[in-house]
Amino acid sequence: MMMNAFFPAMALMVLVGWSTPSPVQKAQRVKVDPLRSLNMEALCKDQAAKRYNTGEQKIDVTAFEQFQGSYEMRGYTFRKEQFVCSFDADGHFLHLSMR
């Protein structure tokens, strides 16, 4: 009786072991035109300065990543408040998210 349950369980374990895992999507480091990235950084700093009611010189942008046809810039204020600026594939500003 135990053998009747053992074989289907073993067959299931073998089949599960042979399935291929789905690929993990990760952020890509991108080479973008320097002028374009500087414009995006300036726009991000401007929007963050307005949102946090401070000057652009007190805003730091620390990371630039590409996600499936869009861009994100991460940064923080002098008070260590974090934010993310999102841009479309053409570099147009979409929104600023506070984190």
Curated annotation (Swiss-Prot):
InterPro entries in the record, alphabetically? YsaB-like (IPR025728)
Q: Does the keyword Signal apply?
A: yes
Signal peptide location in the record? 1-26
Name the Pfam families for this protein. Answer: YsaB
Write out the entry's keywords from A to Z: Signal
Per the record, the domain of life is Bacteria
The identity of this protein, by name, is: Uncharacterized protein YsaB
Write down the species: Shigella sonnei (strain Ss046)
